[in-house]
Amino acid sequence: MLDEATIAALAAELHEAARRRIQVRHFSLRHPSMTIDDGYAIQRAWVRRRLDEGRVVRGRKIGLTSRAMQQASQIDEPDFAPLLDDMFFAPGAVSFDRFIAPRVEVELAFVLARPLRGPGVTLADVLAATDVVTPAV
């Protein structure tokens, strides 16, 4: 497990790299004992920074839902993350200038008619709260 100072430093590094549009070396290569929970702690710290800058959480995503993508990423489970307001684009062309190494991965988007609150949310709760399911990139 990473300590709080390391988590904060890595979140700051990620934030600066995104701002400057540069890639960072995989954190897990520099911190071989890093866990999935550490990765989510870094994500939470990075999101807090973005929220402090005025960004707003507009949704959530689940990635690496296919076994092939999990194997390519050397991860054995789907991942999840919040989607911030500046991660949404109007229909039409999207400028590549904003991205470091653009790639497209098609996922399913569940548009909710009402919020889900946990713990204890069931599959039936998700289905009942879902307004529409649509492809997303």
Features from the language model and the residues they span:
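Active-site microenvironments in enzyme catalytic cores
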Residues: L2-V137
